[in-house]
Design a protein with these regions (language model features):
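Glycine-rich, proline-tolerant flexible connector loops at the mouths of alpha/beta enzymes
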Residues: 26-33, 62-68, 87-107
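Alpha/beta enzyme core
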Residues: 69-91, 110
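An N-cap/entry alpha-helix motif that binds or orients negatively charged groups
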Residues: 2-68
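Active-site phosphate/pyrophosphate-handling residues
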Residues: 3, 75, 102
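Alpha-helical segments flanking ligand/cofactor-binding loops in enzyme cores
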Residues: 6, 77-78, 105
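Hydrophobic faces of well-ordered beta-strands that scaffold small-molecule active sites
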Residues: 53-57, 88-90, 113
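Alpha-helix-loop-beta-strand connector modules within alpha/beta enzyme cores
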Residues: 38-43, 47-49, 99-114
Length: 114
């Protein structure tokens, strides 16, 4: 592997292989069945009358390290929404970006924004 992107991809492939090994398709389908509402990212951007802004929620990056010391994804989401973000991009990759998949569900349960 020659660069960080290749390392991230390889790590994610390994993680997905473990998830597939430990969860049947039926189990995964049952988990997403309960997610009964979705916000359309594309429509939000296309239908926005002003400037569309995609705001990123990211605790760390492989190149810069820890970006936000007292990271609170819900507070960051609220700040972005209060400042007219059209959509939120939430990094969930754990090893390199220190994200968590739960961030998306938490934000989805608290705010109405793609």
């Amino acid at each position: 592997m020659t660069n960080i992107l290749e390392k991230i991809i390889q790590t994610k492939r390994e993680t997905l292989d473990l998830i597939k090994k430990n969860n049947s398709l039926a189990t995964l389908e049952a988990k997403i069945k309960n997610l009964n509402f979705f916000y359309n990212f594309k429509d939000a951007i296309q239908n926005n009358k002003g400037i569309s802004l995609i705001s990123e929620i990211k605790k760390a990056s492989p190149s810069a390290g820890l970006l936000v010391k007292n990271f609170n994804h819900l507070n960051i989401a609220k700040m972005y929404i209060d400042n007219k973000a059209t959509c939120l991009s939430v990094l969930t990759e754990e090893k390199y970006f220190l994200g968590k998949l739960d961030y998306i569900l938490d934000i989805k349960n608290n705010f109405k924004i793609p």
